[in-house]
UniProtKB/Swiss-Prot annotation:
InterPro entries for this protein: Globin-like_sf, Globin/Proto, Globin_bac-like_CS, Hemoglobin_trunc, Hemoglobin_trunc_I
A single cellular component GO annotation: cytoplasm
Protein name in UniProt: Group 1 truncated hemoglobin GlbN
UniProt source species: Synechocystis sp. (strain ATCC 27184 / PCC 6803 / Kazusa)
Cofactor stoichiometry and binding remark: Binds 1 heme group per subunit.
GO function terms (MF aspect): heme binding; metal ion binding; oxygen binding; oxygen carrier activity; thioredoxin peroxidase activity
Keyword Chaperone among record annotations: no
Length: 124
């Protein structure tokens, strides 16, 4: 059985999606301010590694846990559910723009928007 990672097109597709996703995020007035002082090359690399893991491309993830990675943003910069939803919307819009089939976009939405994932990111 293929993983979501494989169905999306593997490394090449995830890398392209992340690059296009951040182009969109950095234009999104709802969330772009969270990335003002971020090393975007490093951020892209982290996101590529995370999505590879989240979509079943590997069982190893060396990045920080979601709670730890976003704690400062929640506590000091007001990261909230609306921001989380905006990020998810931008990811799904990017995939749609890339021509990813709706059934795969729905699978990505189930992973990206999972309630447990949202709670972890928002430290709830």
């Amino acid at each position: 059985m293929s993983t979501l990672y494989e169905k999306l097109g593997g490394t090449t597709a995830v890398d392209l999606a992340v690059d296009k996703f951040y182009e969109r995020v950095l234009q999104d007035d709802r969330i772009k301010h969270f990335f003002a002082d971020v090393d975007m090359a490093k951020q892209r690399a982290h996101q590529k590694a995370f999505l590879t893991y989240a979509f079943g491309g590997t069982d190893k993830y060396d990045g920080r846990y979601m709670r730890e990675a976003h704690k400062e943003l929640v506590e000091n910069h007001g990261l909230n559910g609306e921001h989380f939803d905006a990020v998810a919307e931008d990811l799904l819009a990017t995939l749609k723009e890339m021509g990813v089939p709706e059934d795969l976009i729905a699978e990505v939405a189930a992973v990206a928007g999972a309630p447990a994932h949202k709670r972890d990111v928002l430290n709830q």
